[in-house]
Amino acid sequence: MKQSQMLIPTLREVPSDAEIASHKLLLRAGMARQLASGIYTYLPLALRSLHKIQAIVREEMNNAGGQELLMPAMQPAELWHQTGRWDVYGPELVRLRDRHDRPFALGPTHEEVITSLVRDEINSYKKLPINLYQIQTKFRDEVRPRFGLIRCREFIMKDAYSFDTSQDGLDRNFQAMYDAYTNIFTRVGLNFRAVEADAGAIGGKGTYEFMALCDIGEDTIAYSEEGDFAANLEKAEVVYKPSAKPATEAPAREKLHTPGIKTIDQLVQALQIEAKQIIKSLIYRVDDKLVMVLVRGDHEINEVKLKNLYDATIVGLASEADIVSVTGAPAGFVGPVGIDPEKVDIIADNFVQDVYDGVVGANETDYHLTHVVAGRDFTVSKYADLRNITEGDECPRTGGVIKFARGVEVGHVFKLGTKYSTAMGATYLDENGRSQPMIMGCYGIGVSRTIAAVIEQNNDENGIIWPVSVAPFHVHVIPVNVKVEEQRQASEQITEALRKAGIEVLFDDRPERAGVKFKDADLIGLPLRITVSDKAAQEGTVEVRIRKNGETHDVKLDQLVDEVKGILSRVDQTGAALFGN
């Protein structure tokens, strides 16, 4: 492909609204342009890479037994009402009405649509199991689109849905998808980890997120180097081992005047104590119930664990009016002592049991209580794992030490069970003629997000460094001076020879200075650059440069095709077949 004929509008300056490397480079390398906040046009180079990612996804999905279809993006609200998600999903769901005033949504996901389809078309165990997938544009009205293709309002996603007659069948499909995802993200060149996760708004039990590791990731991953444990912060279990009780009982509690001191940091400074001696008390509204949650002052409440403990739909901090009605005091001076259990549940994180001489709010403005002990001074209805894991905690699997990393979610696999099939009446007749709900799994990949994650992990100060498997082209052929006939002819011959060998070539035939073309080549980041100078005619050699490490090789023209194939195979780390015959 001649570069002069392609739309590749490279930029020298970094766009002011681009925050991260992948966003900057997608814009500077002429691969994407923003139409509106969180909405992008994919230009020819980016689209070539997207198509390659999609081809890898299709190959692995088909190998795992998936069947591709394509569902509508526009979904009737009626389906979402059947599952109850129309009211639960929130403002991220793009809602609209047609000319007949009928409500619809632009799909962020397709559980309702696929369940409706399978419900209407499959009614016997003989037609199960089945795994159906699509690659399609999705919509989500993000409150704050950011980081380019990492968090968009319109994005490309692969979503798959399996339907089984048994839990064992679901487990097999789930493992097949897990293995397929591992192959996909390995082949596209990502450094990733599969981490235990919470199912969130999708619902279901048993889920893993596939995280591309990078510093700009919005998610924190807890992992241990001693084994294969990895989980996101929402899911990571905290190991609790009771500490030894002190030999002496804490003194009787005292009321202390603490004017204007509301935060943990302020209490630590004012009382000259450690944060772990404070019992932090927060009041939540869990669905229609008020709950006081206690956690040690140096820990943070995990709202996902709280939601799961109550099997709740909605969890959020209580209003100031609710807090005052329960405690008589504003937030910052709230505590468990003297609280009426008829008005509010009192639950606590496991580690609150280790606070034997603690500080809590006195339920009175500008006052706290000291020398407080759980069990003696207040009663907890239930202890549970309710806090975020922290670095240095014990790994729940291996006993090793927990460390943190940042990651971008590029894939997610769920065991949905019968959540959607029961709600929507997706049943089949078993061997005995009895009606049973189908058992479902759900499996998503952010295709457009993956391209951003690949760039985020593969770049330097000069531009993108594409992995061979998803590069827009394999080789960039650049004549130093395209006006020199010998250089042009040699470049055209090289391009054609490589093309016939199944190697994809971008031929920079523009009448630009060599320095400009080299800068653009580094910015675009194709795996190999072949520089054609006068030496091509005089000595029969060209320079081959590896983008990944900057190595250069002088290669004879009659050996060039084989040498390029060999270098590309060595540079590629996925072990995939790269070229045709």
From Swiss-Prot:
Positions of transmembrane segments: none
Source species of the chain: Brevibacillus brevis (strain 47 / JCM 6285 / NBRC 100599)
Name assigned to this protein: Proline--tRNA ligase
Pfam families: HGTP_anticodon (PF03129), tRNA-synt_2b (PF00587), tRNA_edit (PF04073)
Entry keyword Protein biosynthesis: yes
NCBIfam families xref list: PRK09194.1, proS_fam_II
InterPro entries named in the record: aa-tRNA-synt_IIb, aa-tRNA-synth_II, aa-tRNA-synth_II/BPL/LPL, Anticodon-bd, Anticodon-bd_dom_sf, Pro-tRNA-ligase_IIa, Pro-tRNA-synth_IIa_bac-type, Pro-tRNA-Synthase_IIa_type1
Keywords recorded for this protein, A-Z: Aminoacyl-tRNA synthetase, ATP-binding, Cytoplasm, Ligase, Nucleotide-binding, Protein biosynthesis
